Structures are given as C-alpha cells and as structure tokens.
C-alpha cells in the first residue's frame, strides 16, 4: 500500500489484535466441538432407544451393584454431554468480548467505533478495561477447563468399556476397526482406539496444568509467555476433536448381547436392594430387619446354597423370575420413554440454538467481506 500504509497502525497494537484474533479462533473451535458434542448426544439417544428393554449391570466400588435398563447407561452419558454443551455455550459469552482499541496495555488515544467493529465481528460492544482486555487469558483457560472436564468423563467411559469388555467377554461387541491383534499372542484383542483416547485424556489434563502453571507466574499485562500458551491450547483442542470422533464412532458401532449379559448376572444378586425395598413396601416390615435377614441368606447363596434363597422368597410369596425383573418397577425405569423423548427434544432445541449462532456469524462474515472488498 506504500507509505500511506504506515497510517494503518494508529490506534492499534499487536496485543489487542492477538487478544481479538485468539477469541475469534477459539470461538470457531468451540463451535466445531459443540457440533461434535451434539452428534455424540444423538448417538447416545439412539443407543438408549435400541437397548431400552435390555438389562445391564451398574457398578459401585468396581462391583455389580444394581441392574437396570441399558438405556439408563446411555442416558447418563447423554446428560453428561448435555452439561458439557451448556458450559461450552456459556464460554461463548467470554469469547465474544471485544478487546480491540485496548492498545498495548491502557488503551489508545484514538477513538475507535467499537459498536461498528463489534457488529462486523459478531462481538459484544461491552467496554472492557484495556489492561484486562490485553493482559487476561482467563477465557482461554476457561475453554480448556471445560474441554478437560469433557475429557475426564471420556476417560471414565473408556475405563468402563475396558472393564465391561473383559467382564462380559462377548456381551459387548466392539467394531473391528477399534480393535487390534497382538503381534505374538493370537488370543488377544486390544481396544487400541480407546487406549489412544485414554492417553489423549491424560495429555489434555497435563496441558491444562501447564497452561495454569505458565499463567500463574506471568505479571499482569501482555507477555510472550502467552504465545506458548496458545500453542499448548490448540494442540490440546486438536487432541480433543480427534478423541470425540473416536468415542462417537465407538458408541455408534457398539452392540450389546442380552443373553451373554444375563448369563454374566446369573450369580450376581444385583436385585438385592430392590428385593428388600419391595418386601418392605408390601409387608410393612422395617427395611433394616429385611436387610439383615437377606444378608444372611446371601452369604449361603453365594457359596452355592440355592435353597436358602428359595426359602426366603417362598416366605414372602415372591417368584424367582419376579425377582429378576423388580428393577422395572422403579419410577425412572417406568418413565424411560419420557426420559428418552425429553433428551431428544432437548437435543433438537440445542441444534436450533447452534444453528442460530452459526447463521449470525455467517451474516457477520459476509458483511465484513462486503465492506472491505
């Protein structure tokens, strides 16, 4: 542009520019991840519908605790990702703040039209303290903190799947492209994609720790330490995006074999709490008394004395098959259809919300390009 190009720099600093560009880049990445989260939620709802009538083991203290519909498991993770979605949407409020005009630290004497600039960039026109606008990276750490929480939950899901695949053997069928064989042991089937997801979870948590460790030691104002934070953050986001794709496909291709699951649960009294609650409600007996009574029966039952349990059930006029299906009378189990429909309706509303955000950003981009051609 020649010598006149020297005028472009007035009222501008790399510090407020990079703070703005970083917000815009993060906003794009967050929206990409939001789309992936919505896709995972749809897959989880589909699985809840598919396995609504199939029994599934639920654990506490790494032991089978209770039984329930497999839909409950998938709806649990759908709720988790719904919460993550809400957090990510909330993070957009921080990313939409406009630091332009803040100069290097305390602002510029040049009066910028913040309303116009903000409108063109789809940013808020809220006036920020310049020192905060250029010297804070809380918005960056906040986004990575939310994404780290998502990875925490993914890490737990990975552990769940590894435990279930080993416990249920062929009860959980995993797609072949998620499995690798051993180079020397022909019997091995390794869940390699989940192992990678587990490693990436640890990487992201380590990266968050690195970001906070760098940030805590930086005196206020812009410092080049921030540049190192950017690299760490965007490498983590790449890992997160890849992991979300792995998990989505893993869940979508997962199959449960009901007969194998039932066989696995045969010698595990996951119905014990349901049974004493049921007897307490129909007999009026104190539940602690029933707890002690059934505990003694189960001590014998678990070492092979089946007759002790039969006598207990006969005493309260309960059939063996009835015991296995007691979980179905729980309020949540009886309202599974309603819970699934609620999750689906909520997802559809969230999809509309994101569509509106994307359409708004598209209009801003078109206006920006049109104005500066």
Predicted regions and their residues:
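Generic amphipathic alpha-helical segments used as scaffolds and interaction surfaces in large
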Residues: 17, 21-24, 28, 68, ...
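A helix-coil-helix interface module used to build multimeric assemblies
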Residues: 1-97, 101, 107, 112-116, ...
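Glycine-rich cofactor-pocket loops
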Residues: 49-71, 171-188, 219-225, 252-266
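A short small-residue
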Residues: 17-25, 60-62, 130-138, 180-184, ...
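Amphipathic alpha-helical coiled-coil segments
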Residues: 26-44, 74, 81, 88, ...
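Leucine-rich amphipathic alpha-helices with coiled-coil/heptad-repeat character
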Residues: 44, 48-51, 85-88, 92-95, ...
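Glycine-rich cofactor/substrate-binding loops
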Residues: 1, 185-373
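Internal glycine-rich alpha/beta core junctions
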Residues: 1-7, 35-38, 66-217
């Amino acid at each position: 542009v020649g010598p006149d190009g020297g005028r472009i720099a007035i009222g501008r600093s790399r510090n407020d520019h990079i703070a703005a560009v970083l917000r815009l880049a993060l906003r794009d990445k967050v929206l990409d991840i939001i789309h992936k989260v919505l896709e995972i939620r749809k897959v989880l709802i589909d699985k809840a519908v598919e396995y609504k009538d199939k029994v599934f083991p639920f654990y506490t203290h790494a032991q089978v605790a209770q039984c329930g519909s497999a839909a409950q498991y998938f709806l649990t993770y759908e709720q988790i990702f719904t919460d993550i979605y809400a957090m990510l949407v909330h993070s957009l409020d921080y990313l939409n703040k406009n630091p332009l005009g803040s100069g290097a630290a305390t602002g510029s004497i040049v009066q910028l039209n913040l309303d116009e600039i903000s409108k063109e960039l789809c940013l808020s026109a809220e006036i920020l303290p310049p020192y905060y606008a250029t010297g804070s990276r809380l918005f960056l750490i906040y986004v990575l903190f939310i994404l780290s929480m998502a990875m925490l939950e993914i890490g737990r899901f990975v552990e769940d799947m590894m435990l279930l695949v080993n416990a249920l053997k062929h009860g959980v069928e995993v797609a072949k492209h998620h499995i690798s064989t051993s180079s020397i042991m022909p019997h091995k089937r390794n869940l390699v994609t989940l192992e990678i997801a587990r490693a990436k979870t640890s990487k992201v948590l380590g990266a968050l720790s690195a970001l906070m460790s760098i940030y805590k030691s930086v005196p206020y104002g812009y410092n080049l330490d921030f540049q190192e934070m950017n690299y760490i953050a965007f490498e983590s986001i790449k890992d997160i995006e890849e992991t979300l794709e792995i998990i989505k496909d893993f869940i979508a291709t997962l199959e449960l074999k009901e007969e194998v699951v039932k066989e696995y649960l045969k010698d595990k009294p996951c119905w014990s709490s349901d049974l004493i609650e049921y007897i307490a409600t129909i007999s009026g007996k104190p539940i602690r008394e029933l707890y002690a009574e059934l505990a003694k029966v189960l001590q014998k039952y678990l070492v092979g004395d089946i007759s002790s349990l039969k006598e207990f059930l006969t005493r309260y006029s309960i059939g063996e098959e009835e015991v296995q299906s007691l979980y179905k009378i729980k309020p949540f189990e009886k309202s599974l259809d309603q819970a699934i429909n609620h999750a689906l309706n909520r997802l559809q509303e969230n999809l509309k919300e994101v569509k509106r955000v994307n359409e708004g950003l598209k209009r801003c981009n078109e206006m920006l390009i049109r104005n500066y051609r």
